[in-house]
């Protein structure tokens, strides 16, 4: 049975958790090390925090079953990007007493579109 059909009856939250787990496993296969998942702050949330070498990688996981309302990547608008940056800054302050200005970090996206393999975009925020 297709992945999308199995997910039809799940809530959005459990669907999100399923794809976050798939993204985590995919990134671990690419050599990244898992640090934390689902970090929530008043200013925003972080889906996955990973590490590649000495770089902290903040990962946004997006999925779309079809493009009727735009692609997974198109759903990461300016407002979402700002919340992502703010949450990462809070995480760095909490965990390492650093900020985005001083830490070695980047922002990646893992996008799932219908039955396609995951699309990993490194340094999405450039």
UniProtKB/Swiss-Prot annotation:
InterPro entries: Restrct_endonuc-II-like, tRNA_endonuc-like_dom_sf, UPF0102_YraN-like. One of its GO terms (molecular function) is nucleic acid binding. It comes from the Bacteria. Gene3D superfamilies: 3.40.1350.10. Transmembrane segments: none annotated. PANTHER family: UPF0102 PROTEIN YRAN. Belongs to the UPF0102 family. HAMAP family: UPF0102. This is UPF0102 protein HD_0802. The lineage of its organism: Bacteria, Pseudomonadati, Pseudomonadota, Gammaproteobacteria, Pasteurellales.
């Amino acid at each position: 049975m297709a992945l999308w059909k199995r997910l039809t009856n799940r809530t959005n939250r459990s669907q999100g958790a399923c794809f976050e787990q798939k993204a985590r496993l995919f990134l671990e296969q690419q050599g990244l090390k898992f640090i934390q998942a689902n970090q929530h702050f008043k200013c925003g949330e972080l889906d996955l925090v990973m590490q590649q070498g000495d770089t902290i990688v903040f990962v946004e996981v997006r999925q779309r079953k079809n493009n009727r309302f735009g692609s997974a990547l198109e759903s990461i608008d300016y407002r979402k990007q700002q919340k992502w940056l703010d949450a990462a800054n809070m995480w760095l302050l909490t965990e390492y007493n650093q900020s985005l200005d001083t830490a070695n970090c980047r922002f990646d996206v893992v996008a799932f579109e219908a039955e396609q393999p995951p699309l990993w975009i490194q340094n999405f925020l450039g």
